[in-house]
Amino acid sequence: MQVTLEKKEGIHCSLLIEVPANEIDSVVSKEINRTAKTIKMDGFRPGKVPAGMVKKKYGEQIRMEVISDLIPQKYSKAIQDEKLAVAGIEVELKENKEGQPLKFVANLELFPEFEVTGFEKIEVQKPVVELTDKEVKQMIDNLRKQFATFSEVYKVVEKDDKVTIDFVGKKDGEAFEGGTANDIDVIIGSGQMIPGFEDGIIGMKKGEQKTITVTFPQDYQNKDLAGAETTFDITVKKIQQAELPEVNDEFVKKFGVKGGVDTFENEIKENMQRELKFILQRKVKDQVFKGLREIAKFETPKSLIKREIDAAKQNLLKQMGGAKGFDVNQLPDNLFEANAKQKVETSLILDSIMNSQEFKAEEAEVESLLDELVQAYEEPEKTKEQIKKNDKEIANLKALVIENKLTDWVLEQAKVTEKTEDFFEVIKENMQAQQAGF
């Protein structure tokens, strides 16, 4: 086998591979003879079909099957010999004639080689959130609202009321698609409508009509409406006031709590603290990763981005329960491209840093992280034992421990400032971030 390496711009190169004719023809001949012993053909007994007949009828097909198997073997050997770190590969067949050498080109995209420096340029704003009894009470009130009963009242609309409305949305004076609805129930202050919409209903009475002006968010999914100033003609048809259940032993049983109200409040606070800890870690980590992407200079392999896009599509399909009749591949790649590119770049950067630093996940550290994570489950010890039996889950935990250590290592060199934030705003931002990333 003859191999010629041709380097191209950036992370691209090609391998021109030539396989001797006698090697190809020998394998094809053996395959034809093997096929002749098993194939059935009219006029011949089983195993007695002449090889020449098989070659005449199936020779081209057999040759292509042989080549399809042989090509990956040959370029894999060439890649190994040349010591190339390949991210993606495309094969282009050049010459394929009987009695002639097989020639093909393997167009390669390589993993970039780079060193990350300038960690002191990374700026991180570390959120500081104080969790007080006030936030715990508000969380309990939110849970009470889930079991609220509503009764019609004849007063002006206030926060937490449920209103039944008709509305017509207009842009530049013309009604836009999807902007008209009748008999829609909206709980004021729930955030189910775009910012400003629910506030515009406060103070209205039953039967009242009103036109409000609202601006759609810049990141709204409908690009025709994103950032657009619109009006809504609103008619209030019904106003209902919420009545919240008392926080007593009967109420807390709805959440599987057996120890009464005090136990319930303690569990709520512990859950809030646990959730807050992981969200704040994620916020800091996201800033660190963003900073790393800004200081690291390299070309991102498109093949890796494409692979990540395909994985994101399959993940979306899984989230939709494998929706029948829905072809996820019909979704445009650019819908996923930005997130995919960020994930690939972050992964490459972390790998680069870990190759230069010795971060290890000690068994005690993995155990400690596992203990924290399982507290969110109803049966922590049972869940812990199940996870410990799963090698993949343990590998993920080890990777998370190392990722946390790497993040702390970067933070020691970065410019870190603190910013006081509200608990519920942090939770809201986290939910929005998760939705944006599918």
UniProtKB/Swiss-Prot annotation:
Keywords for the protein's UniProt record, in alphabetical order: Cell cycle, Cell division, Chaperone, Cytoplasm, Isomerase, Rotamase
Any one Gene Ontology BP term: cell division
Subcellular locations according to the entry: Cytoplasm
Role this protein plays: Involved in protein export. Acts as a chaperone by maintaining the newly synthesized protein in an open conformation. Functions as a peptidyl-prolyl cis-trans isomerase.
Keyword Cell cycle recorded: yes
Protein name, as recorded: Trigger factor
Species classification: Bacteria, Pseudomonadati, Pseudomonadota, Gammaproteobacteria, Thiotrichales
Entries under SUPFAM superfamilies matching the protein: FKBP-like (SSF54534), Triger factor/SurA peptide-binding domain-like (SSF109998), Trigger factor ribosome-binding domain (SSF102735)
Recorded superkingdom: Bacteria
Annotated ranges, domain PPIase FKBP-type: 160-245
Organism of derivation: Francisella tularensis subsp. holarctica (strain LVS)
Similarity remark: Belongs to the FKBP-type PPIase family. Tig subfamily.
